[in-house]
Design a protein with these regions (language model features):
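PLP-dependent aminotransferase-class I/II
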Residues: 99-137, 141-144, 151-158
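General beta-strand structural signal in soluble alpha/beta enzymes
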Residues: 3-6, 55-59, 81-82, 141, ...
Length: 345
């Protein structure tokens, strides 16, 4: 069976496996205080074009989101995101578990617009009883979004300016950041993104690493005791160099972006294969997540030979399904998908 189920169902890049093997006998200090982690941090600072950026390595995406949000916000503050935001839908109430309300607003193509944000904040501040409410303290967005959409240069700059107007911190979830930045729909680079938010993270788990995310405080100083809070949230790895080595490898010779381009190329071909067989594309995603509309009959037949996820049962006759590519996706797998679909054309 071929699989397009997710971008983290393989082990890790061969280059990372090799680097871990080569350094296996080394003895270094723990918790990220090692030369590999320092090298990785320096490479990331160079990549974001900010020598003062503060970089921290955490174990996974949910831990990263909860740690950053809980560390930046006061106890009475909440975080704003769209209704389809990852922290609202797919993180098991983790943010709320640490005492911060997720304030949801409607999105446009799964993106938060400045108009929606401004309207909410104006309405909130106009309410004389707002001191008795959860105070908005942060805006959370994903790049790319849950539906694979990409914020444009203009949208991101405007959103950050709006956040600054209302004294809100902008936090960008970059679990799939590489795929967003190299997509044809993206008209900016990593330094631009870093300059137009307060804090973001560079995803490793979904972009070639065995595990790990790199948090970058680029528009603000890291909160006091952030490192301690990372441990409090269970996101600090004692063998910290395991994360440092991975990001040091990913940011050597632009490997992070090279593998992201490969995934985008594979996703583009998947889309063309579905279109060739007359299958409707559900969302116009330019990234490594592709969404198609299948009939129940085709879904049942295809799922016997291909692994993928149901995204939404839209109706009795339509099932939206997600197909995801990664560094590990092979042309031969796409050939096989094409061949399988021919039988049902």
């Amino acid at each position: 069976m071929i699989s397009f189920e997710s971008d983290y169902n393989n082990g890790m890049l061969p280059e990372i496996l090799e680097a871990l093997g080569k350094t296996n006998g080394d003895k270094t200090s723990g918790y990220g205080f090692d030369p590999y982690s320092e090298s990785a941090k320096e490479k990331i600072r160079k990549a974001v074009d900010n020598e003062n950026a503060e970089v921290f390595f955490l174990t996974g995406g949910t831990q990263t989101n909860t740690t950053v949000i809980d560390s930046v916000l006061m106890g009475c503050e909440g975080v704003i995101c769209v209704e389809t935001g990852h922290i609202e839908v797919h993180e098991s109430g983790a943010v709320e578990a640490f005492g911060h309300k997720v304030i949801t607003l409607p999105g446009k193509n799964s993106k938060l617009t400045t108009g929606t944000l401004s309207a909410y904040m104006d309405s909130f501040l106009a309410d004389e009883s707002h001191p008795h409410m959860v105070q908005p303290g942060m805006v959370y967005i994903s790049m790319p979004t849950e539906f694979g959409m990409v914020y444009t240069r203009e949208e991101l700059a405007a959103l950050y300016a709006t956040c600054q107007k209302y004294d809100l911190r902008l936090f960008i979830d970059g679990a799939r950041l590489g795929y967003g930045l190299v997509s044809a729909a993206c008209d900016y680079d990593l330094p631009f993104l870093a300059k137009h938010c307060d804090v973001f993270y560079i995803g490793g788990t979904k972009v070639g690493a065995m595990m790990g995310e790199a948090v970058v405080f680029s528009g603000m100083k890291a909160p006091k005791y952030f490192f301690t809070n990372v441990k409090r949230h269970g996101a600090l790895l004692a063998k910290g160099r395991m994360l440092g080595i991975q990001f040091d490898t990913l940011f050597t010779d632009e490997l992070y972006f090279k593998i992201s381009r490969h995934a985008i190329a594979m996703a583009t071909r998947i889309r063309s294969i579905f279109e060739k067989h007359g299958i409707t594309i559900a969302y116009d995603s330019p990234t490594n997540q592709q969404f198609v509309v299948l009939s129940p009959t085709l879904y049942e037949a295809l799922s016997q030979k291909v692994a993928f996820e149901i995204w939404e049962r839209k109706s009795e006759h339509e099932i939206i399904c997600r197909f995801v590519t990664s560094w590990a996706t092979k042309e031969e797998e796409l050939d096989e998908l094409d061949h399988i679909l021919q039988a049902y054309a």
